[in-house]
Amino acid sequence: MTSISPLNNVHELGSFGNFEGKNSNEIITIKEIKNFKIFQVVKYKTSKTNIKEYKIFDLNFPDDLKVSGNNDTRILWIGPNNWFIFSSSEKLSEEIRKNLSNNEFAITDLSHSKAIIELSGKNLKEVLKKGCPINFNELNKNQSINSIYNGIAITLDFVNDQPATVRIMSLRSFGESLYHSVTDASLEFGYKAF
């Protein structure tokens, strides 16, 4: 089975917008994150277990608005008793089966249902402010939040502070619209798509 990326028809490589005469650290970089395993884990209301007792690849399930991660895997809090697990590891399914009980958690494979765009650069928060009503001055590395971007429901994962890097996730069916919104907002600063 061949996997077709959600942005296959729109993600064009190259430099665009107001990039001429600028250093690489002054423009926005945009890339599609693909070939990730994505699972949603929801603790049942009837579950008596403490989430602090569970780990995936030695990562704890984080508290409100937090992310725990390493080089291959990130666990995002997306709501009360609700998390996304993103991993480049082919063994994520096995790790989840080994560590989480179907009697305690609803576990759903979302690997083909999300579009993920990674943005970085010093003007990143200005790009986000153009379409999202969140106070980005309060958000830092290893935090996550659900919001909207120009009317599209998104999840934001703040991956790094230096350079400022965020992953924006939406449903696959909104991926192209989100991509157009983000790239349009980036034209003012110039952007390079990888």
For the regions a language model picked out, list residue spans one by one:
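Basic, glycine/lysine-rich polyanion-binding surfaces/domains
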Residues: 1-194
